[in-house]
């Protein structure tokens, strides 16, 4: 308005304008009310703000790479690095870049829009959605695709990934265009395209309108090693999650019967794909065919032989060897003292020595059971000290009633550990230490006994031979073992570890009794100070 007023004043008479009209117009424009209206209009006028840049986070990370080596040279640089690495500052930049890269205006209609397959589906106008996302080159979106009715459909969204955090896409959404170009129907090509794009990405989608399901808090302990890059069945190797035996994972999605989504509890980070219980059991249970080529067709046509085996209690260990363990559901518990400490190992690896040392050093905290026997007591033996003496008929009746954890016969007499004797020690507030046969773990691994299972592994044959020679020379034992006996111990130790590894909370190689005792003592103390992951059945 000020510019118009100045022009009116300087307007030459040659324009033909009447002077009275100019005076009238000038009077209106100088009126205070009109000036106020003009100022209000300027204030309310919508002026579009343009972002200077939509990749500030990427620029800041590049700056950090350049100046981080100088933090020890200049205090100001160190302070700046600290500010730029602040989580709040990084989140602010990320939020700015996301907002700056979004398209708030109506997007221009693409050339394909008029004749595309979208129109052929006779969908309502409001079914088509245009979304804008911002990403860096090489940054995974955390999403996989599948072909459905010749369309590319979102098969799964990885928990914790970029798409999951933004919440803009959902499972079942159909991807029609990326940056104005139709995507076709090849999932791998789309994955590569999205992986290499940087900056602003505009997606045209047909929403699925499915209800989102809140993920359950499910945690599992893994009983096998897994590397997605060695898996030929996984739909996208880059989306897989690598883990090792014994790690704890959080399962965040189990909708797919073959592929679950999980994340590391200890390391955190985005979720990845892991084989489901069903899929991995099928893989582990698969056995190559045994063919019988003894028929009359000289091997040109053959029939499959099926191995039949009836379950026998005497062959319990053989069936344990073929038991398939994949995942075990667990729960996190605050620190607590376990009811039992179970030492598993081959004969002669030092379990009894470790047990006796714990009880002698701390009898108020640790105890053990007194075994039962059907043999007659000797003259110097008292009932309840080394053994509890009962009649054979009574012991056989209790064994039949399932009152014994384990039992055996030696030189015509029965020996065994009664379940009630374990509970008697626990009821005194002490941890009951047991050195039992590994088959007993099936009974012990319950909330009633809450065991901490430690496998005492045999060392290498040379080390075991040297240890045995040392105890014989010191006069600790008079029993001489041959190389065959020692090798049998090593082989038995390896067999037990293969068959029962999934039960073990800790493995200690006993190549030095003092060091093995220290390791075991440290592990038991940790149980009283640190949270523990235990089977879910112990909690619920």
UniProtKB/Swiss-Prot annotation:
The residue ranges of the PDZ domain are 130-209
Q: What is this protein called?
A: Protein PALS2
Which terms in the GO cellular component ontology are assigned? cell-cell junction; extracellular exosome; membrane; plasma membrane
Q: How does it assemble?
A: Interacts with CADM1. Interacts with the LIN7 proteins.
Q: Which residues form the L27 domain?
A: 1-48, 49-107
PTM annotation (Phosphotyrosine): residues: 500
InterPro entries associated with the record = GK/Ca_channel_bsu, Guanylate_kin-like_dom, Guanylate_kinase_CS, L27_C, L27_dom, L27_dom_sf, MAGUK, MPP6_SH3
Q: Which organism is it from?
A: Homo sapiens (Human)
Q: How does it sit in the membrane?
A: Peripheral membrane protein
């Amino acid at each position: 308005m000020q510019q118009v007023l100045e022009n009116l004043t300087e307007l030459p008479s040659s324009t033909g304008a009447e002077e009275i009209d100019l005076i009238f117009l000038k009077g209106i424009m100088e009126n205070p009310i009109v000036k106020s209206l003009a100022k209000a209009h300027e204030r309310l006028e919508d002026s579009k703000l343009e972002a200077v840049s939509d990749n500030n986070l990427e620029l800041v990370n590049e700056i950090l790479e350049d100046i981080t080596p100088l933090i020890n040279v200049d205090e100001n640089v160190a302070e700046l690095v600290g500010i730029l690495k602040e989580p709040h500052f990084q989140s602010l930049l990320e939020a700015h870049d996301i907002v700056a890269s979004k398209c708030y205006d109506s997007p221009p209609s693409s050339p394909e829009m008029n004749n595309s397959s979208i129109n052929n589906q006779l969908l309502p106008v409001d079914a088509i959605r245009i979304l804008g996302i911002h990403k860096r080159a090489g940054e995974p979106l955390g999403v996989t695709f599948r072909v459905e009715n010749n369309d590319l459909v979102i098969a799964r969204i990885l928990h914790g990934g970029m798409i999951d955090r933004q919440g803009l896409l959902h499972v079942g959404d159909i991807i029609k265009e990326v940056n104005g170009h139709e995507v076709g129907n090849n999932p791998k090509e789309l994955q590569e395209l999205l992986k290499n794009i940087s900056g602003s990405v505009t997606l045209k989608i047909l929403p699925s309108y499915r209800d989102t399901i809140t993920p359950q808090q499910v945690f599992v302990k893994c009983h096998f090693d897994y590397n997605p890059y060695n898996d030929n069945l996984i739909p996208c190797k880059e989306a897989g999650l690598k883990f090792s035996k014994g790690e704890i994972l959080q399962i965040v999605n189990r909708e797919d019967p073959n592929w679950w989504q999980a994340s590391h509890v200890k390391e955190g980070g985005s979720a990845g794909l892991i084989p489901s219980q069903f899929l991995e059991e099928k893989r582990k249970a698969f056995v190559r065919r045994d063919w019988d080529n003894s028929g009359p067709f000289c091997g040109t046509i053959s029939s499959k032989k099926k191995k039949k085996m009836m379950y026998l209690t005497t062959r319990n260990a053989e069936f344990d060897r073929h038991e398939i363990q994949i995942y075990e559901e667990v729960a996190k518990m605050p620190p607590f003292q376990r009811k039992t400490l179970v030492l598993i190992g081959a004969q002669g690896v030092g379990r009894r020595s470790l047990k006796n040392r714990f009880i002698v050093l701390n009898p108020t905290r640790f105890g053990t059971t007194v075994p039962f026997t059907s043999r007659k007591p000797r003259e110097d033996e008292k009932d309840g000290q080394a053994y509890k003496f009962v009649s054979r008929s009574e012991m056989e009746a209790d064994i039949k009633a399932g009152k014994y954890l384990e039992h055996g016969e030696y030189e015509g007499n029965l020996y065994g550990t009664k379940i009630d004797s374990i509970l008697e020690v626990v009821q005194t507030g002490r941890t009951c230490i047991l050195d039992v046969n590994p088959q007993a773990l099936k009974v012990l691994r319950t909330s009633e006994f809450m065991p901490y299972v430690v496998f005492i592994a045999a060392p290498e044959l040379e080390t075991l031979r040297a240890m045995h020679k040392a105890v014989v020379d010191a006069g600790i034992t008079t029993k001489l073992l041959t190389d065959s006996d020692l090798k049998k111990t090593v082989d038995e130790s390896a067999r037990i570890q293969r068959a029962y590894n999934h039960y073990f909370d800790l493995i200690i190689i006993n190549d030095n009794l003092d060091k093995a005792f220290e390791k075991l003592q440290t592990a038991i103390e940790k149980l009283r100070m640190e949270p523990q992951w235990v089977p879910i059945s112990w909690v619920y």
